[in-house]
Amino acid sequence: MDQLHSLFTELLGLESPFHLGLIEKDLREGQISSMTFTIEIDKDYRPSRFHNIHSYYEKTWQHLSLFQYPSFIKARLPVFMDKRNGKTEVIEIPWARKGSGFTLLFEEQVLALLRLCNCKTTTANFFNIYPQRVQTIYDCYTKSLYEQRSPEVARKVGVDETSTKKGHDYITLFVNLENGQILDIQDGKSSDTIKNYAEELRILGKSIDTVEEFSLDMSPAFISGVKRNFSRARMTYDRFHVVRLIGRYFKPLYRSKKIDHELLDYHLKDFDQLWTQLNCENAAAFLCYWKDRTKELFKMNRLCKSINKHFMGIVNFVESKVTNGLLEGMNSKIQFIKRAARGYRYTENFKRMILFAFGAL
């Protein structure tokens, strides 16, 4: 029995003045239903020579399961009175936060599963607790961190918007493309979104010149915002959006019987050579050639004008190698978070859950 007490004392991380008392199994219909560990405090313990024991109180905390059995920690703890001022105080316990009915280790596992599955109901069902208690644990650990959090800056930044609810409500994510860390989340998707990010960095004394590369779609608002507020940063338009733009212009041509579809296929496939050019000079020369051939073969003046408008942002990929692929993957998870919660009434709660899900809180 001494060996068992010694083992569980070590597993529970108990140190003086706390020690392990009874270990009890709770039976239901002759079968073990749960385990309870009673923690006691040394009888002669006092915070100081000015303290006397005033009273006792009992409390139980749910702990991590022992094998397949739910386990609980129970303690009868003293309330001390300070003889100098007559005030009472309780002893601080190392295994749980104040006011919680769960141990710190239990709450840690709840948060780990919630971060993984992004659904409070699923997490609650797994641990056999009420969803509101999962919400309470989540709020306790994330609210203050979210309020204290400030925007970060990085060398390579990806920018992408995502919807917060049905309609036209959006938030914009700023992500470090080198490690996937969320740098900031701003409301909206206008040029002011980029401006607000830059201004917050300046207020915090963080140099906006740290940003060398921006990866973004061809949103005029984002392009304008980066040009005005991050003038030293190089812009690269996401490959996927560039290819999608070209495909959108070519799609109507496939409906025509007067145009050779094999020639269309070849010309579209030929565009992929752009991404393998050695440098921006070669890429610019190739894009000019491809654009001129497009105009000559298919009379696509509007596409050529669009390429001219976004020319450098397209060819910059050859050297920057940055894309928004990481953000597109994150966006899929973000939309799952929104669906799992059946929407968020308040945008700040949605932003907090995103930061939590991606490890930024």
Show the residue positions of the predicted features:
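Short, conserved DNA-binding cores of transcription-related domains
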Residues: 1-93
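Short, flexible loop/turn elements at secondary-structure junctions
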Residues: 41, 82, 127, 161-163, ...
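Short, positively charged, Gly/Tyr-enriched micro-motifs
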Residues: 60-168, 208-209
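Gly-rich Lys/Arg/Thr-decorated short loops/hinges at beta-loop-alpha junctions or inter-strand turns
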Residues: 91-94, 177-183
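Active-site beta-loop-alpha junctions of metal-dependent nucleic acid enzymes
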Residues: 99-102, 183-207
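The DNA-recognition helices of helix-turn-helix-type DNA-binding domains
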Residues: 130, 141-145, 218, 253, ...
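Acidic/histidine-rich catalytic cores and adjacent linkers
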Residues: 138, 166-168, 176-180, 187, ...
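Short, surface-exposed amphipathic charged segments that create phosphate/polyanion-binding patches used
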Residues: 248-257
